[in-house]
Amino acid sequence: MINKAVEQIDDLLEPQDWSFPVPIVYGPGRLSEISTHCLGMGIQNPLIVTDKGSAHLPFIKQLQDFLSLANIPSALFGEVSPNPLEKDILAGREKFHNGKHDAVIAIGGGSAMDGGKSICLTANNNYSIWDFEFEQPVPIIHQDQPFPTLVTIPTTAGTGAETESTAMVTDVNKGMKFCVWHPDLK
């Protein structure tokens, strides 16, 4: 009976490709494929976004090394708070612009996912992060201001934030977390 359970667990770890509605590449060791995926999506200079707790962990260096080996320059923004704040998003947006990045790779847990998605929401337009608040009318994104390409790499088992266009951001003035989103962010 134990052997059967082990076999079932092993089956879950087999490499798989899904679409939910975004493509999902799943399985141990798949980080090594990041350059191939970036090149396939036309990504030339991504901003890597993660939380403060993950910024110095080995998988960040591995990601940077895989990109570098494929001659894909990147920069790291590792300043996302455990519950992302507007100031984190503004600082990430500034780093995105200053580095002339064309994509965001969000890697880490839910906060990194939320930070990366929020930076994408505001990167190429003049909207505030609060203009994307879930209860508000959806902002119009013009063709000349598309969202940057977003790649999400979850390192924790959690809410599935990597599959959604929503993010949670904390408004310190109101002492509340708000859901921000746009249906075109994928």
Task: Report each predicted region and the residues it spans.
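A general structural motif
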Residues: 43-45, 101, 147
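An N-terminal, well-structured beta->alpha segment
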Residues: 1-77
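Conserved beta-strand elements of the Class I
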Residues: 47-48, 103-105, 151
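A glycine/threonine-rich phosphate-anchoring loop and its flanking beta-alpha core
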Residues: 125-186
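N-terminal small/polar loop signature for handling phosphorylated ligands or for N-terminal nucleophile
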Residues: 55-129
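Hydrophobic residues at beta-strand termini and immediately following loops
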Residues: 25-26, 77-80, 153, 180
